[in-house]
Amino acid sequence: MSDPSLYTYPSPLQGWENLPPLPNERAADGKSFVNPPATQKSTAYTEFPAPINNGIRGGFDVHIYFLQSDPTQVQYATKLWERIRREFPELRVYQLWDRPIGPHYTGMFEVNLFTPEQFGAFIPWLVIWRGPLSALLHPNTGEDVRDHSQRATWLGQAFPINLGPLRRFVEAKEKKEEEEKAKA
């Protein structure tokens, strides 16, 4: 879906350099390692790491896919959409599309997650309740094409994403922003 060589990646140890070496001591299970205690709990428990959006846009989108030509999947998706709206009313849930829309080649609906707490509750729930459907999870970082490709995670079978319309949308948005800047 995406060529990782198109992007650069900061070191995962950024901000954690120059610390003492980790111990090689094994835990009681003999397999895992004993980790040194943290001085404070990671902020990732309460806010998404940069560059993921922590505002009104939402940190993650979850696109739940179904084959609109399969009556069983359409029925399951419709019931799942209702269940999500009832069990997770704090989440933003969009229309159930029974046809391709935007970069999505098949029927789907979208759910927005705003906090790590919501992510931690909803994704394990969805792993069980997605049934025969697939789900695309992606962060919202402002890099829409990369978010839908290189940063995407799938539950179930991966579907192709039509990145062409997404690229054109991004280009049009950037052009409009440039025109508005020029007017100011």
Give the location of each predicted region.
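Long, contiguous binding/interaction regions
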Residues: 2-184
